[in-house]
Amino acid sequence: MSSRGGKKKSTKTSRSAKAGVIFPVGRMLRYIKKGHPKYRIGVGAPVYMAAVLEYLTAEILELAGNAARDNKKGRVTPRHILLAVANDEELNQLLKGVTIASGGVLPNIHPELLAKKRGSKGKLEAIITPPPAKKAKSPSQKKTVSKKTGGKKGARKSKKKQGEVSKSASADSTTEGTPADGFTVLSTKSLFLGQKLQVVQADIATIDSDAVVHPTNSDFYTGGEVGSTLEKKGGKEFVEAVIELRKKNGPLDIAGAVVSAGHGLPAKFVIHCNSPGWGSDKCEELLEKTVKNCLALADEKKLKSIAFPSIGSGRNGFPKQTAAQLILKAISSYFVSTMSSSIKTVYFVLFDSESIGIYVQEMAKLDAN
C-alpha cells in the first residue's frame, strides 16, 4: 500500500531477467519478428538467441583479453579482437567473412624471408642443402631397377627408397613434415604466427618429421622408452652416432640439448635433451628451458617440423598434467618471442590414452597464448 491507500506500483520484470541473461530478449524478439512477419516465433527463440550471443561475446572478450595481456597492453583494442578470432578455429570459421573495424590485417610472414636478414643463419643453409642433390640420384636409379624385378617385393622396395629420398631432402624445402602413413592426428591447435600443434598416437621412431626429440641424461643414456625405441629402429648406425656425440660433446648439462643425424630413422635429425627430475631445484623452469633449447636447435637447422614425446613424465617423475602444461607453455612463449621461426609443425607423439587426453585438454586451454 502507498501512503494514500493506493496499490504500490510494482516494477515490471524484463524478459532478460526472467531468462537469466544480460542481452535484451525483448529486442531480439522484435528483430526476429521484423525479419519474418509470416512465421510464428516461439517464446524460447529470442531467449536462446540472446544466450548464444552472450556466450560468443564472453568467449571473444576472454580471448581478446589474453591477446592484450600477451602483447603487454592494458586495454583491449579491435586489433586484439581480430587476433582472438583468428586464433580460435571455430570462431574463425564463423566470423571469417566479418570485417572488424580498426582491427588491421593478419600478417602472413614467411620466416625464411626474415631469417635471411640474419647473417649467422645464412651460412647454415649452405651446410644443409648440398647433400640432398647427391643422395637423390641414387635412390631414383635403384627405384627403376626394382620396378623391373616386378611383383609386390619390388613395389615395397621402391616405397622404402622413396622414404629415403624424402629423408635426405633439404630441411629448407617448402613441404611441411607430416607423420608417417597410417597415423591420424587426434587434435590440432594453431598459434598466432601459423604454427600448428598436433597430437599424434604413434611410435616416435616411425614419425616422418625433420627432427625427433630424445629425452636422455648427462651420459646420453638410450635405455629409456624413447631411447630404446629409437635405438631399435636406428640400429648400429644410430648407436655409433650417439657414442661419437658423447665423446665430442662431453656430459650434457641439465636443460641442455644437442643434435645428431637421424641414422636409420625417418627423421633427419635427433635432438638429445637432458630434462630435470621432478622435485629438483627449479625443475619446472628448467623443463621449460629444455623445450625452448630443443626448438632453438631446430630453428638453427632451418627445420620445419619437430616431434616431442612427453618429456619429463617418464623416468624423471613429472606428473603428466604438469609436464604437459609446462611443455605447451614453453612452446607458446617461444613462438611469441621468436618472430622468425622456421618451424611450422610441432608433433606431440604419444602412445597411452591418459597422456593423449591430457595433451588434448591442455591444448584446448591454450586459447590465445
Curated annotation (Swiss-Prot):
The modification N6,N6-dimethyllysine is found at K123. The modification N6-methyllysine is found at K18. Present in liver (at protein level). A glycoprotein binds at D203, I204, V226, S275, G312, S313, G314, N316. It comes from Gallus gallus (Chicken). Keywords: Acetylation, ADP-ribosylation, Chromatin regulator, Chromosome, DNA-binding, Isopeptide bond, Methylation, Nucleosome core, Nucleus, Phosphoprotein, Ubl conjugation. ADP-ribosylated. Monoubiquitinated at either Lys-116 or Lys-117. May also be polyubiquitinated. Ubiquitination is mediated by the CUL3/SPOP E3 complex and does not promote proteasomal degradation. Instead, it is required for enrichment in inactive X chromosome chromatin. There is a cross-link at K123, K167, K189, K320 (Glycyl lysine isopeptide (Lys-Gly) (interchain with G-Cter in SUMO2)). It holds the Pfam family Macro. It is found in: Nucleus; Chromosome. The modification Phosphoserine is found at S170, S173. The modification N6-lactoyllysine is found at K7, K9. Variant histone H2A which replaces conventional H2A in a subset of nucleosomes where it represses transcription. Nucleosomes wrap and compact DNA into chromatin, limiting DNA accessibility to the cellular machineries which require DNA as a template. Histones thereby play a central role in transcription regulation, DNA repair, DNA replication and chromosomal stability. DNA accessibility is regulated via a complex set of post-translational modifications of histones, also called histone code, and nucleosome remodeling. Belongs to the histone H2A family. This is Core histone macro-H2A.1. Residues 128-180 are annotated as: Disordered. Residues 144-160 have a biased composition (Basic residues). Residues 15-90 form the Histone H2A domain.
